[in-house]
């Protein structure tokens, strides 16, 4: 018996389980699970939420999961009585075992599992500003699946791993931003022998990120009134919204749709600009507190995309300055006792701004998604190694595609994969 189907929320038609597009509209395909009430599984890491993940098996090794706990320190500092933090990262005494220190693992593991289930043999192509690349390198190293990473040159410091054997990973840098890395990746993924991971259209990525909301609600036993997250493309917000829809249908956790509070880093905040109509000018992404949050082409207007999620939840987008993020990060780390990545500091600052603007009340139930943390802690306890750069390119190089194809073929020939 099938576990799930994939439907188009635009036309309502059932599509292939691996579909990324509907032939009739621009909607993001969405999973519909036959099991309407989720039961946590006795499985490792994120597979605890196996019921609502679009997979029919698991990757046993290497998966962590979101961990939700009631905040004391940060909540007290902000005078919030019901702030719950969902932490994604490395924090052993708090059951945090995500070894990439980023919630991007929640996307990479189910995506990889689906490739394996589909007997996919093509090289997986991933464009990333760093954290997604690290997550896919982690799971590719565990499974031995061939992976081509295309990342901006300035993001290579994020390409580290705790795995020893990274021979299935080929890393290419582009002297440009994330958008230029995406453009290059799209060209390569269109070639024979390569497959794209699908981005926001990949239901495995979205449902994987949706486990943040699942963990929060199954831990607190109720849907929150407010959900905070820093976003680049906004896909994490879509994921939280879709998970909340399923939890409302589950029937055991209330029927209130959590209000989405999404945060972007000024001055490079396309979603914020689109949503508010305010134009922001700056040197992007160089002037950002965290350039992983810069995405020039977010899925805003697609059916089932960011705008629909905001409209359905009465959501809001905040523009956060570097100074606001830095101050919020210090307050969080001092009061919670764990280091966090720059991106979730944007979300911490958004909570502080929401309080100032009266968008939330001190006694309301709030979930804060800490999308990455514990890297300093991990580096103290575990050995890490940088991924080697196999090829460095200029986006203006007319022969760039051929050079990438040759490099991948060379690594394959030499047994790199």
Swiss-Prot record:
GO terms for molecular function: ATP binding; cysteate synthase activity; L-serine ammonia-lyase activity; magnesium ion binding; pyridoxal phosphate binding; serine racemase activity; threonine racemase activity. The modification N6-(pyridoxal phosphate)lysine is found at residue 104. Its EC number is 2.5.1.76. SUPFAM superfamilies: Tryptophan synthase beta subunit-like PLP-dependent enzymes. GO terms for biological process: coenzyme M biosynthetic process; D-serine biosynthetic process. Its cofactor is pyridoxal 5'-phosphate. It is an enzyme of class 2 (transferase). Pathway: Cofactor biosynthesis; coenzyme M biosynthesis. It catalyses: O-phospho-L-serine + sulfite + H(+) = L-cysteate + phosphate. Pyridoxal 5'-phosphate binds at residues 131, 371. Pfam families: PALP (PF00291). Keywords: Coenzyme M biosynthesis, Pyridoxal phosphate, Transferase. NCBIfam families: cysteate_syn (TIGR03844). Homotrimer. Belongs to the threonine synthase family. Cysteate synthase subfamily. PANTHER family: SERINE / THREONINE RACEMASE FAMILY MEMBER (PTHR43050), SERINE RACEMASE (PTHR43050:SF1). Specifically catalyzes the beta-elimination of phosphate from L-phosphoserine and the beta-addition of sulfite to the dehydroalanine intermediate to produce L-cysteate. This is Cysteate synthase. It comes from Methanococcoides burtonii (strain DSM 6242 / NBRC 107633 / OCM 468 / ACE-M).
């Amino acid at each position: 018996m099938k576990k799930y189907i994939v439907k188009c929320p635009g036309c309502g038609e059932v599509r292939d389980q691996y579909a990324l597009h509907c032939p009739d509209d621009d909607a993001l395909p969405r999973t519909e699970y036959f099991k309407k009430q989720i039961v946590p599984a006795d499985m490792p890491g994120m597979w605890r939420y196996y019921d609502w993940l679009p997979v029919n098996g698991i990757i046993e090794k290497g998966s962590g999961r979101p961990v939700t706990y009631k905040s004391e320190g940060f909540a007290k500092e902000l005078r919030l009585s019901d702030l719950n933090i969902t932490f994604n990262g490395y924090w052993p005494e708090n059951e945090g075992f995500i070894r990439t220190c980023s919630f991007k693992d929640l996307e990479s593991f189910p995506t990889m599992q689906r490739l394996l289930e589909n007997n996919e043999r093509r090289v997986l192509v991933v464009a990333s500003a760093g954290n997604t690349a690290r997550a896919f390198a982690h799971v590719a190293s565990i499974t031995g699946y061939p992976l081509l990473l295309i990342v901006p040159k300035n993001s290579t410091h994020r390409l580290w791993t705790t795995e020893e054997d990274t021979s299935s990973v080929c890393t290419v840098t582009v002297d440009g931003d994330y958008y230029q890395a995406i453009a290059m990746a799209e060209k390569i993924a269109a070639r024979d022998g390569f497959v794209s991971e699908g981005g926001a259209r990949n239901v495995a990525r979205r449902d994987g990120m949706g486990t943040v909301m699942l963990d929060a609600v199954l831990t607190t036993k109720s849907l929150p009134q407010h959900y905070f997250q820093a976003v680049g493309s906004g896909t994490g917000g879509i994921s939280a919204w879709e998970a909340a829809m399923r939890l409302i249908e589950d029937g055991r956790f209330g029927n209130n749709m959590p209000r989405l509070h999404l945060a972007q880093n000024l001055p490079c905040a396309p979603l914020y600009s689109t949503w508010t109509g305010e134009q922001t000018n700056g040197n992007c992404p160089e002037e950002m507190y965290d350039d992983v949050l810069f995405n020039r082409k977010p899925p805003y207007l697609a059916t089932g995309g960011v705008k629909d999620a905001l409209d359905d939840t009465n959501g809001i987008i905040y523009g956060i300055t570097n100074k606001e993020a830095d101050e919020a990060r210090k307050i969080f780390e001092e009061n919670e006792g764990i280091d966090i990545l720059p991106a979730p500091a944007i979300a911490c600052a958004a909570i502080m701004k929401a309080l100032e603007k009266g968008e939330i009340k001190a006694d309301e139930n709030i979930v804060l998604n800490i999308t990455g943390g514990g890297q300093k802690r991990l580096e103290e306890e575990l050995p890490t190694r940088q991924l080697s750069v196999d090829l460095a390119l200029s986006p203006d190089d007319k022969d760039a595609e051929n050079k990438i194809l040759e490099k991948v073929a060379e690594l394959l020939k030499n047994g790199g994969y």
